[in-house]
């Protein structure tokens, strides 16, 4: 058989189409498509037409495109490039291009990514470098329009299309006649626009071309969506890492804004995806000092005419922190940066500080508005390319600084996702300033408190003259300053001048302070400490003890009842319960020392009003302490005195002993809140019941002292018994004290009526003062009787207090009955008068005058 020519084969195939179909169904898939799709550099005969290609099964083409996706899984651009090569061949287009869609500064735009892809072009030649991108908004060109409407567009003659722009043609010298553009969409977001340009074998792209283009671009869409999803995952991962680490570092540093920013920004540097970033911190001064304004007002200095922040501050960057991430990591801090520093010379940070805008700039050195440095900014040779600048705004919406990020690491410009990440960061940093501001305010308040405390202490602390009025060292030792005296000499002098405890009835439950001056009461208080033998045992400096005692006296305000006399009486009763009542056997000397001192301080700085009034008037004390308001204030005042070494009577105790004293102060003073009395009295009653059944004193002591809680419950009830002890005094004393208490209550009632505009309760209503005996009887029955009855059961030595209480109840009951009798007589007389008045009215109605009996409506003639 002779050699068959090519022409003969073509003629045979044309005359036998059925044979040709069978042959190509078997052979073309492997031989022809293998050359077309697998070898990007293989030449394909240009005469191969679409009808000829569509004779091949479409599944084979899909398989080849999937193989391309698998081979180029690492780069969506490379996969898209290979697909565009094949589409250019299939559609018989002169070339294909792909434009990516993004947004900057809130404005969507398209940018060239792959340009002029042909069946034989190389990827490197078609890929557009980030610094050579052609970028234009969506209102320019057909590509922008397709991205805007998100629909494919087949333009047969571009000159007749109103959306066509010849911008690209002028740039490249290319002539566009017709084109087919299709958007690639993920949800509602356009990722890219792919375009086929200039149909070769026809004047325009056909409907069949549109179908093929859209069909096979779905593979490109899958690759781009995968890449976009991966990018979004990276964005969210970076955002969460930035927030987590910045929060971690922000709360590590609360004292200084600069250190707070630096710790946060340095820690998150790896997640910012840029070569370099800088933070400019703004001066927060809103008003100049008066002496800084003098030169301006006198004309010696020109007034500031530069830009200002939205809140009116002069834009002055007092510090720049420059973070270098390219090459060797480095941090530069530039205090008081000059205006020509490369971070400021462009004017962008100033513009952002003035307007509060986010500025995302592509190819920043070419910008005409801002003057960025076009060459290297420093000796590293680093050059500015892309810039993203944002304001740092605090919770008050004041701009406190400007953060500027330079050159995204992948070379691309910063996009909207970078804007969101950095905006999240700057917002968090701005809001975190609330921590440092709060810390600063707290520090200032603490300083003001310390100053106020010092001022108050200066007024209340016993002066040297007041101390010498009790410790007469000048007269006795003939020295001018107390520091020249020895401790034993001062103690001897003090013992000589203090009153005799028996003569002053300090051991008696019936003690009365009325015959004694307030100054002498200070001496009596000092005597009580000497009587319990704690001064020498715990090495209490005599001068310190005297100063503390006198200062406690001055700490009590001159109110009607809760004054120094009441404070002393409570201290004296505590002493009497311990010594005369023999409760001291349950407590150590240190505990007795603390209990006596706490009793003297229990109402220090009382305002003459109760806790309820503090809450009603929303006083600072009520805002500071939620419960037991005044008691907690008395406790804090007492602890404040002990913080001053010259007043700390416990200064020679060890740490553990001092902690014990403070705890006992807390228990004792808070226990004087009567609101807590009803909670503790059941516990106390159980202790008394148990002790009453004990066979010996030793057994009782062991039972009580073995449990610190029992000792605290007893101590708390002792404080209540001391606080209410005026109700147990002899009648001539108790009746006067009751009037003092009542007067203080009435004064509070007057305040409630005038200041708070509220009606006081009967106990504090001055208009119901005649009901005082009845109220006293109720108070004795409801509150007091239990306390002294149980203490009498607990220790028989305390029975005199119960007897005094019962005697006073008889007196108050008698007065209450007298008052009730008077009220009854008054009511009876008022009733009789009403009856007489009503009887007289009835008689008048029945036996009226003749004139009254005449009818006013009918006249008899």
Swiss-Prot record:
Query: Where does this protein hold 3',5'-cyclic GMP?
Result: 97, 116, 169-172, 176
Q: What is the top EC class of this enzyme, as a single word?
A: hydrolase
Every copy of the GAF domain together lies at: 75-224, 256-433
Query: According to its UniProt record, which residues of this chain constitute the active site?
Result: 562 (proton donor)
PDEase domain mapped to chain residues: 486-819
Q: Where is the composition biased (Basic and acidic residues)?
A: 826-839
Q: Which InterPro entries match?
A: GAF, GAF-like_dom_sf, HD/PDEase_dom, PDEase, PDEase_catalytic_dom, PDEase_catalytic_dom_sf, PDEase_CS
Q: Which residues carry this modification: Cysteine methyl ester?
A: 858
Its cofactor is: a divalent metal cation
Chief place where the protein resides? membrane
Specify the protein name: Cone cGMP-specific 3',5'-cyclic phosphodiesterase subunit alpha'
Q: What is the lineage of its organism?
A: Eukaryota, Metazoa, Chordata, Craniata, Vertebrata
The protein's gene is named Pde6c
């Amino acid at each position: 058989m002779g050699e068959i020519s090519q022409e003969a084969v073509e003629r045979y195939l044309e005359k036998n189409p059925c044979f040709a179909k069978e042959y190509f169904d078997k052979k073309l898939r492997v031989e022809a498509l293998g050359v077309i799709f697998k070898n990007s550099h293989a030449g394909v005969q240009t005469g191969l037409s679409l009808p000829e290609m569509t004779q091949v099964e479409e599944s084979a083409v899909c398989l080849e495109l999937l193989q391309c996706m698998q081979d180029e899984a690492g780069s969506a651009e490379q996969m898209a490039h290979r697909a565009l090569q094949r589409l250019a061949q299939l559609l018989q287009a002169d070339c294909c291009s792909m434009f990516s869609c993004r947004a900057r500064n809130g404005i969507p735009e398209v940018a060239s990514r792959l340009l002029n892809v042909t069946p034989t072009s190389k990827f490197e030649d078609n890929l557009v470098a980030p610094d050579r991108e052609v970028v234009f908004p969506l209102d320019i060109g057909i590509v922008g329009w397709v991205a805007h409407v998100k629909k494919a567009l087949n333009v047969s003659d571009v000159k007749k299309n109103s959306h066509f722009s010849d911008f690209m043609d002028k740039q490249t010298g290319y002539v566009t006649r017709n084109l087919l553009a299709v958007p690639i969409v993920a949800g509602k977001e356009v990722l890219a626009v792919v375009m086929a340009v200039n149909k070769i074998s026809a004047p325009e792209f056909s409907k069949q071309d549109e179908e093929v283009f859209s069909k096979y671009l779905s593979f490109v869409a899958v690759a781009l969506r995968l890449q976009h999803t991966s990018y979004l995952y990276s964005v969210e991962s970076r955002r969460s890492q930035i927030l987590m680490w910045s929060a971690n570092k922000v709360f590590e540093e609360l004292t200084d804004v600069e250190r707070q920013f630096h710790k946060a920004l340095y820690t998150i540097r790896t997640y910012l995806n840029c070569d370099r970033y800088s933070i400019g911190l703004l001066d927060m001064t809103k008003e100049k000092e008066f002496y800084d304004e003098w030169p301006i007002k006198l004309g010696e200095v020109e007034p500031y005419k530069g830009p200002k922040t939205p809140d009116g501050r002069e834009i002055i960057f007092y510090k720049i922190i420059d973070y270098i991430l390219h090459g060797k990591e480095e941090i530069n801090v530039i205090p008081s940066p000059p205006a020509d520093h490369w971070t400021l010379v462009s004017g962008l940070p100033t513009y952002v500080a003035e307007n509060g805008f986010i500025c995302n700039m592509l190819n920043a050195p070419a910008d005409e508005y801002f003057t960025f440095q076009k060459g290297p900014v420093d000796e590293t040779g680093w050059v500015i390319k892309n810039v993203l600048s944002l304001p740092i705004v605090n919770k008050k919406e004041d701009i406190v600084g400007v953060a500027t990020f330079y050159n995204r690491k992948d070379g691309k410009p910063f996009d909207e996702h970078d804007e969101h990440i950095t905006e999240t960061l700057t917002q968090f940093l701005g809001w975190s300033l609330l921590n440092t501001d709060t810390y600063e305010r707290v520090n200032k308040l603490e300083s003001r408190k310390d100053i106020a405390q010092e001022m108050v202490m200066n007024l209340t602390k016993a002066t040297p003259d007041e101390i010498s009025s009790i410790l007469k060292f000048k007269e006795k030792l003939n020295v001018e300053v107390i520091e020249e005296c020895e401790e034993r000499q001062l103690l001897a002098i003090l013992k000589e001048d203090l009153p005799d405890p028996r003569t002053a009835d300090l051991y008696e439950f019936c003690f009365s302070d009325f015959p004694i001056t307030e100054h002498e009461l200070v001496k009596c208080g000092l005597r009580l400490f000497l009587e319990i033998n704690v001064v020498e045992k715990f090495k209490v400096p005599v001068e310190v003890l005297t100063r503390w005692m006198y200062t406690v006296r001055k700490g009590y305000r001159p109110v009607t009842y809760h004054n120094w006399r009441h404070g002393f009486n409570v201290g004296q009763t505590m002493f009497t319960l311990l010594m005369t009542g023999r409760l001291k056997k349950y407590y150590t000397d240190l505990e007795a020392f603390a209990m006596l001192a706490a009793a003297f301080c229990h109402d220090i700085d009382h305002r003459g009003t109760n806790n309820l009034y503090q809450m009603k008037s929303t006083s600072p004390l009520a805002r500071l302490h939620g419960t037991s308001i005044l008691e907690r204030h008395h406790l804090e005042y007492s602890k404040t005195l002990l913080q001053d070494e010259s007043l700390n009577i416990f200064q020679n105790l060890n740490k553990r002993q001092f902690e014990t004293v403070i705890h006992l102060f807390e228990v004792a003073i808070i226990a004087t809140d009567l609101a807590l009395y009803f909670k503790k009295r059941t516990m106390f009653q159980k202790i008394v019941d148990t002790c009453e059944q004990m066979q010996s004193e030793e057994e009782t002591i062991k039972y009580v002292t073995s449990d610190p809680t029992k000792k605290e419950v007893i101590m708390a009830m002792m404080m209540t018994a001391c606080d209410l002890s005026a109700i147990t005094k002899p009648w001539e004393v108790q009746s006067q004290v009751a009037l003092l208490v009542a007067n203080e209550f009435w004064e509070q009632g007057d305040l409630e009526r005038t200041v708070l505009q509220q009606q006081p309760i009967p106990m504090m209503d001055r208009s119901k003062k005649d009901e005082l005996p009845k109220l006293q009887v109720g108070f004795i029955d409801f509150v007091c009787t239990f306390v002294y009855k149980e203490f009498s059961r607990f220790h028989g030595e305390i029975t005199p207090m119960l007897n005094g209480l019962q005697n006073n109840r008889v007196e108050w009951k008698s007065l209450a009955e007298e008052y009730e009798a008077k009220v009854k007589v008054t009511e009876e007389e008022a009733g009789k008068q009403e009856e007489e008045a009503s009887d007289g009215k009835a008689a008048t109605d029945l036996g009226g005058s003749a004139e009254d009996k005449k009818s006013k409506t009918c006249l008899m003639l």
